[in-house]
From Swiss-Prot:
The lineage of its organism: Eukaryota, Viridiplantae, Streptophyta, Embryophyta, Tracheophyta. It is found in: Vacuole; Secreted, Cell wall; Cytoplasm. This is Alpha,alpha-trehalose-phosphate synthase [UDP-forming] 1. Expressed in seedlings, leaves, roots, stems, flowers and siliques. Required for normal embryo development, vegetative growth and transition to flowering. Regulates embryo growth, cell wall deposition, starch and sucrose degradation, but not cell differentiation. Involved in the regulation of glucose sensing and signaling genes during plant development. Residues 92-559 are annotated as: Glycosyltransferase. The keyword Magnesium does not apply. In the N-terminal section; belongs to the glycosyltransferase 20 family. In the C-terminal section; belongs to the trehalose phosphatase family.
């Protein structure tokens, strides 16, 4: 949207995320203040308050109608207000996508529909929010198979700013009643998956999941049809977990947020779901993922870490450089609506009647859906125990329980209804009299006015949810208690406990004794303590409104997109394959340096299971690379080096049949496939630290399940990739602390930390440090007479080894003379004491780029010659990796440059890593395969 503050480019972007969010908050407050000064504000007009206050009656429908239909008036008013500000402001379009529209449709004729507004929690959250121009997308709740009916309904809904998604009966049955209500909802509330003993039922799960994905795609199709550039798409709840992925596949630049209104279970619960990985990855496609509480957000990040093996950060979840922000956004209510309602004559009359009806008795209140997670039986049993232990209260207290029926056709809910009725009847029969009973139970909902009156006269509200995303009944009770200042007893398993816990009495609803004791505490609480508790909760409810919740979420979503754009600007672009191939074909002498692990390795088919340890530890060349590698190796103008941290035996097994150079253990060992292994660094490295480090690695391997360590000639590696992620990190931290203060405190070693590994290697053993010497061996072996004018370096290298990318990096502009590295002559390159040839020298301006550690290592070795051990003595007898003839005498003086490399002919590319020194990126080994196939085709073509 042109001119939109969220889309325009600004010459100044605040440095920090917090600064940007604070500035946006100030602008919102300023606009609210301007609107408050205008008496014609449609949404904020107080003269209509009496007609706007009913949850389930005509007044509620009028209130929401006013919100949905008053867009034009609101926008006109906004324009008038914003003209008073420094600059104009255009409201951002917000596409709210939920399973159900905030209307119920009834067909009156072939092309006639009657629409009834149903003010649910989500609608209430957005009532009065004038920051956005909202459109609602969802299912209308009816099956409309004919085209005439669909067009008529779409036209009628358009007047309400609603857009329908048409789902047939079979989809609704499988997707909504099946997968959403029978699988996801119970799982997210810790009720577990259905326990079935028939294969047919298992097959029905598969069909339900397929319907779930299909329905989400249908929602995405409607969103895509109405999407305009700059819109924010806000997806809601567990019904639409696949929607973010579907939307991003359509338009990767779309701003997508997803919010869950239920709890998110612990990773141990979520991992029981057969489709666990698909759902998590689909949600991670969103830019911002929101939950009611930090606990739910933490569980989600933990599930992504433990199930998908991704990196969890304080900001969210990171996958190959892309960050999905995960945060808590506690929802609220429209508190002013409840406060104003207490002044309505109808509510005042209700309050008077209730006070007269229950005069002389303390009133306790429970308002719940008749649902398994609401803990109604536990609440009533706790009340029974209280009456049993406190005979003096039996005729002084009454419990009013409002149980709104839901899913009355489901056997489990019918059983719950019977159970509640049985308990209530037993208690009333035991403690009741001819004139009064201790429990008044209603199986129906109350209108808004009656509910507000009931809240206002209540002394103690009792919320005993076994699991609840938030539970706004507690908020509504607090909002109506400004005069009475009653006490809130709140389940610690309700999301509201995180927000109202300081002022409420928190209880474990499963502990009947504790709840009964809390009832006594609440009824006997002093007025002073009640006032303090209420003041805290009332302030929270007043300030953390539903409108503020919606504005905060969308504001953070917009800023998350800005943050992502800033992050992406620092990420190298994707490898320009066409350009790389063209320059390859035009060059005369090419050098290809390829990593192995996570670059040329085969994919592991683990059917969505993370960490198939046995298969992944056995590194194998990607089967589709055999042909391309042979074609590239057969080209006399192309030299290929596989540069890997793997051992010599692994490289021999995978590349023995190819005509290429193999550099094992980060370039420490080198050989042409038809030759013998040689060392590229001095043999006498200080390796006295090996035994003590190995002892430490063994200790932590024994105490970290599924971890292992590898012993190589120049390094030791402890790997915890397959261990529990969090436990592995703790163990790695302790291991490093022990190493630094003990075995390697004075040793000449480098410690390299991978994402799931710790490596200790001899000082100076890096891929970049070895390249200079490898290059000299290659030039000497091939008797090159033409300088190398094209270099391609591709790999998934750890940060310590990324100096291989910068080794060839020209520092002059591409239009200036090429960088030249001279081949040293025999008289200028003095030999070391062991007879090793020193590395070719670099141009002066490259002296600090790589190889500096090698120099320090050589000096260290010369100074500590008495403590050195030959690497050859470390090899096991019978090894095929003999170092015989590992060194050749220096060649005769060569009068030409080894490298004649210009900037445009150098392509460094990181695989699966976005934080890199490389110029370009490739996403995965499969992308490497695709590129090398194209390169091989160029080599094969005449």
């Amino acid at each position: 949207m042109p001119g939109n503050k969220y889309n325009c480019s600004s010459s100044h972007i605040p440095l920090s995320r917090t600064e940007r969010l604070l500035r946006d908050r100030e602008l919102r407050e300023k606009r609210k203040s301007n609107r408050a000064r205008n008496p014609n504000d449609v949404a904020g007009s107080s003269e209509n308050s009496e007609n706007d206050l009913r949850l389930e009656g005509d007044s509620s429908r009028q209130y929401v109608e006013q919100y949905l239909e008053g867009a034009a008036a609101a926008m006109a008013h906004d324009d008038a207000c914003e003209r008073q500000e420094v600059r104009p402001y255009n409201r951002q379009r917000l596409l709210v996508v939920a399973n159900r529209l905030p209307v119920s449709a009834v067909r009156r004729g072939e092309d006639s529909w009657s629409l009834e507004i149903s003010a649910g929690g989500l609608v209430s959250a957005l009532l009065g929010v004038k920051e956005f121009e909202a459109r609602w997308i969802g299912w209308a709740g009816v099956n409309v198979p004919d085209e005439v009916g669909q067009k008529a309904l779409s036209k009628a809904l358009a007047e309400k700013r609603c857009i329908p998604v048409f789902l047939d009966e079979e989809i609704v049955h499988q997707y909504y009643n099946g997968y959403c209500n029978n699988i996801l909802w119970p799982l997210f509330h810790y009720l577990g998956l259905p326990q079935e003993d028939r294969l047919a039922t298992t097959r029905s799960f598969q069909s339900q999941f397929a319907a779930y994905k299909k329905a989400n795609q249908m929602f995405a199709d409607v969103v895509n049809e109405h999407y305009e550039e700059g819109d924010v798409v806000w997806c809601h709840d567990y019904h639409l977990m696949f929607l973010p992925k579907c939307l991003k596949e359509y338009n990767s630049k779309m701003k997508v947020g997803w919010f869950l209104h239920t709890p998110f279970p612990s990773s141990e619960i979520h991992r029981t779901l057969p489709s666990r990985s698909e759902l998590l990855r689909s949600v991670l496609a969103a830019d911002l993922v929101g939950f009611h509480t930090y606990d739910y957000a933490r569980h989600f990040v933990s599930a992504c870490t433990r199930i998908l093996g991704l990196e969890g950060t304080p900001e969210g979840v990171e996958d190959q450089g892309r960050l999905t922000r995960v945060a808590a956004f506690p929802i609220g209510i429209d508190s002013d609506r409840f406060i104003r309602a207490l002044e309505v004559p109808e509510v005042i009359q209700h309050m008077k009647e209730l006070k007269e009806r229950f005069a002389g008795r303390k009133v306790m209140l429970g308002v719940d859906r008749l649902d398994m997670i609401k803990g109604i039986p536990q609440k009533i049993l706790a009340f029974e125990k209280f009456l049993e232990e406190n005979a003096n209260w039996r005729d002084k207290v009454v419990l009013l329980q409002i149980a709104v029926p839901t899913r009355t056709d489901v056997p489990e809910y019918q059983k719950l209804t019977s159970q509640v009725h049985e308990i209530v009847g037993r208690i009333n029969g035991r403690f009741g009299t001819l004139t009064a009973v201790p429990i008044h139970h209603l199986d129906r909902s109350l209108d808004f006015h009656a509910l507000c009156a009931l809240y206002a006269v209540t002394d103690v509200a009792l919320v005993t949810s076994l699991r609840d995303g938030m539970n706004l009944v507690s908020y509504e009770f607090v909002a109506c208690q400004e005069a009475k200042k009653g006490v809130l007893i709140l389940s610690e398993f309700a999301g509201a406990a995180q927000s109202l816990g300081a002022g409420a009495i928190l209880v474990n609803p499963w502990n009947i004794t504790e709840v009964a004791a809390s009832i006594g505490q609440a009824l006997n609480m002093t007025a002073e303590e009640r006032e303090k508790r209420h003041r805290h909760n009332f302030h929270h409810v007043k300030t953390h409104t539903a409108q503020e919740w919606a504005e905060t979420f969308v504001s953070e979503l917009n800023d998350t997109v800005i943050e992502a754009q800033l992050r992406i600007s620092k990420v190298p672009p994707e490898l320009p394959q066409h350009d790389a191939i063209q320059r390859y074909s035009k060059s005369n002498n090419r050098l290809l340096i390829l990593g192995f692990n996570a670059t040329l390795t085969e994919p592991v088919d683990n059917q969505g299971r993370r960490g198939d340890q046995i298969k992944e530890m056995d590194l194998n060349l990607h089967p589709e690379l055999k042909g391309p590698l042979k074609a590239l190796c057969s080209d006399p103008s192309t030299t290929i080096v596989v540069l890997s941290g793997s051992s010599r035996s692994v490289l021999d097994k995978n590349f023995g049949e190819y005509d290429m150079w193999l550099a094992a253990e980060n370039g420490m060992f080198l050989r042409l496939t038809n030759g013998e292994w040689m060392t590229t660094m001095p043999e006498h490295l200080n390796m006295e630290w090996v035994d003590s480090v190995k002892h430490v690695f063994k200790y932590f391997t024994e105490r970290t399940p599924r971890s292992h360590f590898e012993t190589r000639d120049t390094s030791l590696i402890w790997n915890y990739k397959y261990a529990d992620i969090e436990f592995g990190r703790l163990q790695a931290r302790d291991l490093l602390q022990h190493l630094w203060t003990g075995p390697i405190s004075n040793a000449s070693v480098d410690v390299v930390q991978g994402s799931r590994s710790v490596e200790v290697r001899a000082v100076g053993v890096t891929k970049g440090a070895a390249i200079d010497r490898i290059l000299g061996e290659i030039v000497h072996s091939k008797s090159m007479t033409t300088p190398i004018d094209y270099v391609l370096c591709i790999g998934h290298f750890l940060g310590k080894d990324e100096d291989v990318y910068t080794f060839f990096e020209p520092e002059l502009p591409s239009d200036m003379p090429a960088i030249a590295r001279s081949r040293p002559s025999s008289d200028s390159g003095a030999k070391s004491s062991s007879g090793d040839r020193r590395p070719p020298s670099k141009s002066t301006h490259n002296n600090n780029k790589s190889g500096s550690k090698s120099s320090s290592s050589s000096n260290s070795n010369n100074n500590n010659k008495s403590s050195q051990r030959s690497l050859q003595s470390e090899r096991k007898s019978g090894s095929n990796h003999s170092l015989g003839n590992s060194r050749r005498p220096s060649p005769e003086k060569i009068s030409w440059n080894v490298l004649d490399l210009k900037g445009e002919n150098y392509f460094s590319c990181a695989v699966g890593r976005t934080r890199t020194n490389a110029r370009y990126l490739l996403g995965s080994p499969d992308d490497v395969v695709c590129f090398l196939e194209k390169l091989a085709d160029t080599t094969s073509s005449p």
